[in-house]
Amino acid sequence: MKYKGTGSLILTALIGGIPSSTAVTMAFSNLSRKFSYLSELFFFSIILSWLVMFFRVIFYTFIIFEGMIYKLVLLLLPYFALLLMFAIFLYLKGNKNHEEGGSMSIKNPFSLSQAFTFGLIYSTISVISHYLKTHFGDEGIYVLSFLSGIMDIDAITLLLARLSDKGEIGVDVAAMGILLAVMSNNLFKSGYAIIFGSKKLKIYFLFVALFTLIYTTTLLILFDKLHMSS
């Protein structure tokens, strides 16, 4: 598909973020090497697709167990708000390079095999989660969340929301598990951009990866202290 202009690129990121922010990140990272003068625009567009992922996670959680929404938003909103502010700053800084001319080809992020893949991942994670919860407690859920988030964020989100709704795991555990899945997914995408993106994009996502690690580690420490004191 051919896309022209700043508006079209941003729209592509927003629409593409609905099924897969990972696909958007990969596509735009690859394009940034050819159109390096648009690195700020690509970064801004990628972060927008991540923001769509955030709203998707909130939406899925609300459908399954709305009682989790408050804690999940409390954990994730500051992170995505700061990312968006950073992206807007860079976008405005590099605005003079965002020419309307030229065209680029972007692969469609949708795939006919997505539904089958999602079902397979969900079933696998569901089986593993019961084993880990039984043998390793909440820590097993956290490990599973972090690892599964690399592959698919939707499956682990739906699963943890369902388990929390049934009372099999606590709301705090489910919310922290979803947080870990989101962060591992963002770290994976950041890593891809660092490896395959333009020089500027590499630097921008190095900051994102570092911020993600600091944010996640801080919340884990606070979460552990709160649980120890309760």
Swiss-Prot record:
Superkingdom per UniProt: Bacteria
Membrane topology annotation: Multi-pass membrane protein
Localization in the cell: Cell membrane
UniProt cross-references to Pfam families, sorted A to Z: DUF4010
Keywords, comma-separated and alphabetical: Cell membrane, Membrane, Transmembrane, Transmembrane helix
Example of a GO cellular component annotation carried by this entry: plasma membrane
Major subcellular location class: membrane
Residue ranges of the TM segments: 8-28, 45-65, 72-92, 109-129, 141-161, 176-196, 203-223
Family: To P.aeruginosa PA0043 and M.thermoautotrophicum MTH1451.
Protein name as it appears in the record: Uncharacterized protein aq_1828
Organism encoding this protein: Aquifex aeolicus (strain VF5)
